[in-house]
Amino acid sequence: MNRIKTLTLLLMIILSVGISAQNPRSVFTDRPVDEAAIYFTPENFNVKTDGRMDVSDALQEALNRTKQKENGCGILFIPEGVYKLSKTIYIPSGVRIIGYGGKRPVFVLAKQAPGFQEVTRETAKGKYLFWFIGGGYRPGGRIGDANAGTFYSSMMNVDIRIEDGNPNASAIRAHFAQHCSISNVTIHVGKGRAGIVDAGNHLEN
């Protein structure tokens, strides 16, 4: 009888964890008020939150603006919605991506996005959808990992989904250091390669 009770309890725990993973809770339901932050909204950028418009370039622009606005660091707030992506997004050092709303915002790598299929020397660990880097980002410039001198970079309260046709896609490269974190992020790898590569020093929920 005790064994049956134990097995029943374990099954209930497993089911509850599964339900929680499928329906992640948003930890920031209201729009935060921060005059120094940048908001990734249709009022500020040419974006739609329906998952049909590719917002890759707009998101990179928003991250670059955030890096340049307040002494090289800052927050980019992402409202609830679905955001289609098709290329690597570089997260500059000192920049935090924070989602908010009744549901977590979702970043979706589009089906068969260019470059996420083949394994090359540069993509041996996967082609990254999000890459935490050291310093800022500019097209054609040198790109390097976040390092021991990278502080405060983070991603919070968002979800990531990799669609089919991207077998070499890795959702996040998180080679970072002090006060950097990934928290309250659910990654649906699907048929992709990996969720997080070279994990940093703080991963939570």
Give the ranges of each region predicted by the language model.
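Bacterial N-terminal signal peptides
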Residues: 8-18
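Bacterial N-terminal signal peptides that target proteins for export
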Residues: 1-8
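Extracellular/periplasmic carbohydrate-active domains that bind, remodel
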Residues: 20-205
